[in-house]
């Protein structure tokens, strides 16, 4: 950890950081913000007066935003504070089905498509103002449609191309169905982090009496694509 801190002290920030937690990702966004506030207040104390680290330490990095809907069911993205010149990180959970909205008196649960559209609305509101735009999408939108079989659409590749065309420089996700989909955007940043280690830590913590040997434990891959995780 000390080596990481030392490396961080020698690295200049790209720009003052701001964090947008979409409605689908509010709780996780708040946890990330709380960690950032604590981490930055407890480390790198020698740089407080440097203009290169303006707004490095803050009581909150969250940006107030919303995606209100018209009576027709259409929506718009609103940033309620300036993000000009910032290194903007936008977090969204496209699989949060608990959120609802009303159209003509009918209650609708938000689908991944709805969450993706709201993400693009916020990106559109920030384009041309933020110094850099990064998207954190724990579940990669349309990641299961990463290749074409017969006459099918290439939804994941199209989504990645669309985001980068709107000005997104980096896309961060976890356990993408096939990380090779990043070939659709070879000149942009794409990171897919594998979580098996975190899964095992959580499993051992939740089941402390778990016996790990060839007689009592078997790890099975649901398909060929997940074999590397099981191994």
What are these regions (language model features)?
Residues 1-231:
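PRPP-associated nucleotide enzymes
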């Amino acid at each position: 950890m000390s080596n990481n801190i030392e490396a961080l002290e020698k690295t200049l920030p790209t720009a003052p950081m701001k964090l947008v937690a979409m409605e689908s990702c509010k709780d996780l966004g708040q946890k990330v913000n709380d960690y950032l506030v604590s981490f930055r207040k407890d480390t790198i104390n020698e740089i407080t007066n440097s203009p290169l680290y303006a707004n490095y330490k803050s009581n909150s990095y969250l940006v107030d935003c919303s995606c209100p809907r018209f009576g027709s069911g259409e929506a718009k993205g609103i940033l309620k504070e300036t993000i000009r010149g910032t290194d903007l990180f936008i977090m969204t959970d496209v699989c949060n089905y608990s959120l609802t909205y009303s159209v003509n008196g009918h209650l609708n649960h938000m689908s991944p498509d709805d969450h993706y559209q709201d993400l693009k609305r916020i990106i559109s509101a920030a384009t041309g103002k933020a110094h850099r735009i990064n998207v954190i999408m724990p579940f990669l939108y349309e990641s299961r449609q990463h290749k074409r079989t017969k006459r099918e659409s290439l939804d994941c590749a199209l989504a990645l191309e669309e985001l980068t065309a709107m000005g997104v420089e980096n896309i961060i996700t976890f356990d993408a169905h096939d990380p090779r989909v990043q070939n659709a955007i070879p000149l942009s940043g794409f990171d897919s982090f594998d979580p098996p280690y975190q899964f095992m830590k959580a499993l051992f913590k939740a089941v402390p009496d778990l016996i790990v040997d060839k007689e009592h434990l078997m790890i099975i891959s649901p398909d060929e694509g997940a074999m590397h995780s099981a191994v």
